């Protein structure tokens, strides 16, 4: 099996190195990652300029693009042999609930949806590196164990690991996405010439974070696994919309 590894924190990120180290002695791995931090890039593709891969001394491939660019090229001709699976991470910071809409880590995994095996997105619920070994351990454990899975095509597994030592993790839970409250207002700054700018504020706290959600699992010390799909159709709205459209036709 050949795994394509990517991330959104950039090719020099410690989480990427930890993920590669955890998986490379298990199976063949190739790394294609953004040359700089692309957190929050979601599923954006670069369409206004060419992409130039750089082959680094450690064997990684650096790309002047987004996480989705990296996986897209990796699956469509940049590599001599197509990977069997895409694994993204390890992100420093949670990708819980609404975060998946913006996350480049999750987007990289979603770009691997056409492969026959499920893609994984791994995130450590911390900006600090102290418990990266915990996240790397569970990444290896879950990727190794995936062979017995019988999942629908185009399934992506979003995994969040609590910021705890390995022996403090209580287990692994299957969860749904929770929801965050609305983010705080952007922070306005004014430069010395009087020109206004804005910093995007931090994400909102968990608004729907009760039992069964990814938020609740990690707060209780469990690794959270949430299966994601690309189809965002809101089926519960069909009945209301059917009646509404009848009056318009």
UniProtKB/Swiss-Prot annotation:
Annotated keywords: Cytoplasm, Hydrolase, Metal-binding, Nucleotide-binding
Cellular compartments annotated: Cytoplasm
Domain of life per record: Bacteria
InterPro entries (alphabetical): SurE, SurE-like_Pase/nucleotidase, SurE-like_sf
E.C. numbers: 3.1.3.5
Principal localisation: cytoplasm
Binding note for cofactor: Binds 1 divalent metal cation per subunit.
Cellular component, GO annotation: cytoplasm
Coiled coil stretches, renumbered: none
Cofactor: a divalent metal cation
GO MF term (any one): 3'-nucleotidase activity
Residues noted as binding a divalent metal cation in the record, renumbered to the chain: 8-9, 39, 91
Record HAMAP family: SurE
Name used for this protein in its record: 5'-nucleotidase SurE
UniProt organism field: Pseudomonas fluorescens (strain Pf0-1)
Gene behind this protein: surE
């Amino acid at each position: 099996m050949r795994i394509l590894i990517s991330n959104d924190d950039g090719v020099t990120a410690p989480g990427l190195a930890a993920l590669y180290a955890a998986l490379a002695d298990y199976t063949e791995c190739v790394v294609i990652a953004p040359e700089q931090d692309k957190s929050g890039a979601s599923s954006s593709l670069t369409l206004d300029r060419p992409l130039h891969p750089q082959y680094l001394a450690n064997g990684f491939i650096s790309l002047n693009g987004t996480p989705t660019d990296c996986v897209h090229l990796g699956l469509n001709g940049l590599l001599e042999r197509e990977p069997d699976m895409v694994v993204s991470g390890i992100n420093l910071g949670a990708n819980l609930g609404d975060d998946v809409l913006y996350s480049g880590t999750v987007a990289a995994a979603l770009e691997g949806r056409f492969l026959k095996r499920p893609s994984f997105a791994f995130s450590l619920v911390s900006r600090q590196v102290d418990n990266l070994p915990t996240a790397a351990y569970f990444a290896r454990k879950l990727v190794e164990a995936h062979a017995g899975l019988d999942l629908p095509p185009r399934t992506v597994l979003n995994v969040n690991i609590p910021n705890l030592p390995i022996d403090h993790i209580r287990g692994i839970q299957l969860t749904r996405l929770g929801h965050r409250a609305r983010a705080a207002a952007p922070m306005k700054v004014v430069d010395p010439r009087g020109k206004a700018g804005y910093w995007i504020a931090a994400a909102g706290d968990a608004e729907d974070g009760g039992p069964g959600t990814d938020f609740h699992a990690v707060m209780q010390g469990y690794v959270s696994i949430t299966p994601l799909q690309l189809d965002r159709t809101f089926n519960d709205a069909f009945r209301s919309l059917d009646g509404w459209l009848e009056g318009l036709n």
